[in-house]
């Protein structure tokens, strides 16, 4: 089991999702998530954490994304401490994801 997470680019995150079925966990606030988020992202909050644990396998890769790639680091480290084996944080956060032209879902 890894003792820390790895920071990856938005494109590396997309490759993990496409090739290995990684779960992408968006930790931004509900309003921002509802407005737009990475395609198929799980909205991870204190309230949804129990469902996250039920749905996500500890051995599968988990990628955490936030606004700019800062607060996702804390959540990624927390998930490592909870026993998840392969945890990643997206450098640049959702801003970087969007600038990279990766798929998003929007309310508009």
Swiss-Prot record:
Residue ranges occupied by any Rhodanese domain in the UniProt entry: 18-106
GO cellular component, one term: cytoplasm
Reaction catalysis annotation: thiosulfate + hydrogen cyanide = thiocyanate + sulfite + 2 H(+); thiosulfate + [thioredoxin]-dithiol = [thioredoxin]-disulfide + hydrogen sulfide + sulfite + 2 H(+)
Cited PROSITE patterns: RHODANESE_3
GO biological process: glycerol metabolic process
EC number: 2.8.1.1
Family as reported in the entry's similarity comment: Belongs to the GlpE family.
Entries under HAMAP family matching the protein: Thiosulf_sulfurtr
Cited function: Transferase that catalyzes the transfer of sulfur from thiosulfate to thiophilic acceptors such as cyanide or dithiols. May function in a CysM-independent thiosulfate assimilation pathway by catalyzing the conversion of thiosulfate to sulfite, which can then be used for L-cysteine biosynthesis.
Full protein name: Thiosulfate sulfurtransferase GlpE
Organism: Actinobacillus pleuropneumoniae serotype 3 (strain JL03)
Name of the gene this protein is made from: glpE
């Amino acid at each position: 089991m890894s003792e820390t997470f790895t920071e990856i680019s938005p494109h590396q995150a997309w490759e993990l999702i496409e090739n290995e079925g990684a779960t992408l966990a968006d930790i931004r606030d509900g309003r921002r998530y509802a407005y737009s988020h990475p395609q198929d992202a799980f909205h991870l909050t204190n309230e949804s954490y129990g469902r996250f644990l039920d749905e996500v396998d500890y051995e599968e890769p988990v990628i955490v994304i936030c606004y700019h790639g800062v607060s996702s680091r804390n959540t990624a480290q927390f998930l490592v401490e909870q026993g998840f084996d392969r945890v990643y944080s997206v450098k640049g956060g959702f801003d970087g994801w969007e600038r990279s032209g990766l798929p998003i879902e929007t309310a508009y």
